[in-house]
Design a protein with these regions (language model features):
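Active-site microenvironment of metallo-dependent hydrolases
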Residues: 1-175
Length: 175
């Protein structure tokens, strides 16, 4: 232990190991696969790739399953929470993520994670950044990520907004 100190690391898969079971759960009518706890671990684990992994699994099942998974990751949770998002339509929040299907197919999630130093927290963090899978990100109608490069305004000006409970129809007295 003295020789390794904080460089000692090991890998353990403690859930979702069986691909068949995981696929069944991702597509089960009583699950909401777009929700994960990736934002809960900012100081140690920051994978944020649960949705990309779900799309990759769907892709292995065929194009129809990709369409179903996009629906399950976007429109379905928006409807569940009663918010005007999750669809590309007039008046909806215009946040889009453009994914390269060839890069997604080639991506091996177990080989793209690495450590970065988080000066804000004074520690290292494990991140999973799949190069070239996410081609573009558009928030509030503004391009913020284009082929691996943040826009000049990213982090300096607001692009979109957080959807809060007050946006729910119940909170607005509409239900």
């Amino acid at each position: 232990m003295q020789a390794w100190d904080t460089d000692l690391r090991w890998e353990t898969t403690f859930a979702n190991r069986n691909a068949k079971t995981l696929t069944k759960l991702l597509f089960h009518k009583q699950t909401l696969p777009g929700f994960n706890d990736s934002g809960a671990h900012l100081a140690n684990i920051g994978f944020y790739d649960g949705n990309l992994r779900a799309l990759k699994i769907a892709q292995q099942e065929g194009l129809q399953q990709v369409s179903r998974m996009v629906h399950r990751l976007t429109e379905l949770p928006a409807k569940f929470f009663g918010i005007n998002a999750g669809l590309v339509r007039l008046g909806a929040q215009a946040d889009l993520c453009i994914i390269d299907p060839v890069a997604l197919e080639k991506w091996d999630p177990e080989k793209t994670y690495h450590f970065i130093h988080r000066s804000q927290f004074g520690c290292r963090q494990i991140v999973n950044r799949p190069d070239a899978v996410v081609r573009n990100v558009i928030i509030g109608g503004k391009m913020v990520w284009d082929n691996g490069i943040y826009s000049e305004d990213f982090g300096k000006t607001a692009s979109g907004r957080v959807i809060r409970a007050k946006d729910h129809p119940l909170e607005q007295g509409k239900m």
